[in-house]
Amino acid sequence: MCSVKPKYISLPEQNSLCSLPNSGCCQVEVKIGRSKWEQQKAILVKVDGEPAGKIFIYSQPLIGQMYPLHELKSMGVICEKAGDFLVNLVTERGLKLTFKPIGSTANCFVTALVSGNFTSLTHETHIKTPLQNQEATTSPTIESDLTDKPDTNVYTGSREGYVAPSEKGSNEKKKEVVPNGGDKSVENKKGSDRNVKKTPSKTVTKPLLSESRKRKEAKTLATTQSQDLPAPTKDEPERTNSEPDNGEQEKIKKEKKKGTETSLKDGKNKLNEKIVKPAPTTTPDAGNGGLTPGKEDNKKTVTTSSVEIEVPEKKKAVENAGIIKIS
């Protein structure tokens, strides 16, 4: 059988109920959950004009549960081996209540609950009031509290009795003004910030990349950087970061070119001075009529503008043989 959790409501004071003539109270142990038992107070009351009585279970002084006996779906009483009575109440809505009456008046409480005759009930949980000794009648205010009233919280579809909420919510708290003119909430915040201490986090952050992957990436970066850099030339010396680059390299190149050109010109002039010689003067001989060259010329040379070419001696002999001497 499925059961519904009990609904706790506000109840009248215990003294007001126990002051009625047909009433009685007893200590009970109420079952909460599967195996938990909690000690509470139970009161049986029957008001004149009602078909049956009611049982009130007080979990707190003014809060508890209320069950009309004529609206119960079932009621069972079990006598255990120890002599205790176990009472099970189930309402039509599925609310379930299980309790054990304890104390000297437990038997009277169970018989009144089963029979519906509340004349033999006693008050065990408190001292008798003076109204009970005088057998006072029920006051009209208590009777009006015990009578069933219609539920005003049921939605009927109309907006009668609707009250608009206030502009400012009830949860908003008013700020307390400090006599010095400051805001108390700001001072509380400052004090709370001072008391706060930073604690190191317990979570350990794992490295995003493994060591092998980092090594591979370092190698690839090194290769790409070496490919991007231009290869150093032989003519241009590698310049360090400390050497300033203010056009000095170009000046050095120009000076080198000028030095090589001047050295080449000087070498050519020296060669021309050695090779080029003035042409020898030939004096005509009286005997041969000026046809034969002088004795001083052993060699015949052919001069050009820049270089003097020597003629070999064989050619000279052939030329001399072809000359005809006239006697």
UniProtKB/Swiss-Prot annotation:
Residues 184-196, 233-276 have a biased composition (Basic and acidic residues). InterPro entries: PH_15 (IPR040443). Residues 129-306 are annotated as: Disordered. Residues 130-144 have a biased composition (Polar residues). Pfam families: PH_15. This is Uncharacterized protein C15H7.4. It comes from Caenorhabditis elegans.
